[in-house]
Regions:
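A general secondary-structure junction signal
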Residues: 27, 58-60
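Glycine/serine-rich anion-binding loops at beta->alpha junctions
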Residues: 61-83
């Protein structure tokens, strides 16, 4: 896992003016019932944490639609972290990664482990995923002194769900 030095921003504020949930991302939604929220990430986090009427806003430093840069996982990780802060809950980064996988499986049953763990735990790491646990090794960052790394958005999109349909793997951990 190699997360770049880019960020995802989620803000959550209580909606004191109306009894609606407002979600702002590339679109804006305002609904009277969380189940009606079309943004999968916002809907699942709001339902899981039983959030009252709120205004939730998403922003990110990287392209977010099928870029292959783990942006959906970064949104989910940041959204869970923001909900925890809003509710006064103290989750570890590992707990947030596990919850991200659980919540994403509600709308994308083919989700993998690597992106949520990479986004939640950061740093240069090697993850080995076993059926009932994850082995994590922190790797030396000295490689960055010897090589230049470039993260380039090609503008080409793809669906990880379509790719994962053709992969045979065990999803029992999480």
């Amino acid at each position: 896992s190699f997360p770049p030095n880019l960020y995802t921003y989620i803000t959550i504020n209580e909606n004191i003016s109306t009894d609606t949930w407002k979600v702002n991302y590339s679109k804006s939604e305002e609904v009277y019932h969380p189940i009606d929220i079309k943004n999968d990430i916002a809907r699942e986090v709001i339902k899981h944490f039983d959030l009252p009427p709120i205004i939730m806003s998403f922003n990110c430093d990287i392209p977010t639609s099928g870029s292959g840069l783990a942006s959906s996982s970064s949104y989910l990780i940041a959204c869970i972290a923001a909900a925890c802060k809003f509710k006064g809950i103290d989750y570890s980064q590992t707990e947030i990664a596990k919850l991200a996988i659980k919540l994403e499986r509600n709308f994308n049953p083919l989700t993998g482990y690597q992106d949520p763990y990479g986004c939640a735990l950061g740093g240069l790491k090697q993850f080995i995923f076993y059926p009932d646990y994850i082995l994590q090794e922190n790797l030396t960052t000295s490689i960055f002194k010897n090589y230049n790394f470039f993260l380039v958005s090609t503008g080409i999109t793809r669906s990880s769900t379509n790719i994962l349909k053709n992969v045979n793997f065990d999803k029992s951990y999480g």
